[in-house]
Amino acid sequence: MAEITAKLVKELREKSGAGVMDAKKALVETDGDMEKAIELLREKGMAKAAKKADRVAAEGLTGVYVNGNVAAVVEVNAETDFVAKNAQFVELVNATAKAIAEGKPANNDEALALIMPSGETLADAYVNATATIGEKISFRRFALVEKTDDQHFGAYQHNGGRIGVITVVEGGDEALAKQVSMHVAAMKPTVLSYTELDPQFIKDELAQLNHAIELDNESRAMVNKPALPFLKYGSKAQLSADVIAQAEEDIKAELAAEGKPEKIWDKIIPGKMDRFMLDNTKVDQAYTLLAQVYIMDDSKTVEAYLDSVNAKAIAFARFEVGEGIEKKANDFESEVAATMAAALNN
């Protein structure tokens, strides 16, 4: 039997990322053959990864990488926040973002087939990470954003990397693009413009807003406060030319009823129309970047602010770790119970 020296164990650890005891056991089982030991560790890693496959990984990090006119934002998950701070995990996240920005895959399958600098596929890198770190490590999603030479990327990560944002701004500079990314991180828009909102989604959200007004009016009635009006519209998508024209006619009728002289109507109507637009685009304000009040200047929307500096938002991508993942509170308890049951049955 070959002598398993500390130097040999160290070499295997450096090549495989395995722990001391795992590396030593692999060398003993393969009689000191380095290549066979690496393959054995890989097989064991796949087995460990398979055992962890049904666990919920809802913690993790986002990664952002800019490669010329292409940028990538990725989300990589782990089971605990503690592991999300692990240096090996952070390195994997950054390497994933870089590989995707450079490889420009079309979907997750193509992304996982990318070859890493180590020579392994991205998929194998995750199998090995799961084995060596000891938790389920999973690549969840990515977005690629592209720009032209005269546009600017704004790359931003918030809350220790739990939120990752890329924006594209035309005009201005990289600093402005980063400010817009900071806004996106804080205000959570889902689309750029109202034109991207689904009509049924707008109707559903408007119904929710009116339900909230109904509940508020019940409370107001108890203290003899006047009821708030219900919203008829929620988005610019619902404000046709006829609707806007009718709103202006209604304002004129209101001014006439109040006895306001016609010669000052032109000074009053624009402000009232702005109020009409504000009151009837609540869904846009919640979900579309351009309609949101800009956090850097709350006197303007994002669109109005960018217009004022001769700039324009072109695109953005925002990931927040764990979005849409149902995290089961009893995962750990279930795992312990299953382990104890297995032990009793053996």
Swiss-Prot record:
- What keywords sit in the KW lines? Cytoplasm, Elongation factor, Protein biosynthesis
Which InterPro entries is this protein grouped with?
EF-Ts_dimer_sf (IPR036402), Transl_elong_EFTs/EF1B (IPR001816), Transl_elong_EFTs/EF1B_dimer (IPR014039), Transl_elong_Ts_CS (IPR018101), UBA-like_sf (IPR009060)
Q: Where is this region: Involved in Mg(2+) ion dislocation from EF-Tu?
A: 80-83
Subcellular localization(s) per the UniProt record: Cytoplasm
Gene Ontology cellular component terms for the protein in this record: cytoplasm
| Gene3D superfamilies tied to this protein | 1.10.286.20, DNA helicase RuvA subunit, C-terminal domain (1.10.8.10), Elongation factor Ts, dimerisation domain (3.30.479.20)
Q: Which family does it belong to?
A: Belongs to the EF-Ts family.
The entry's protein name is: Elongation factor Ts
Which gene underlies this protein? tsf
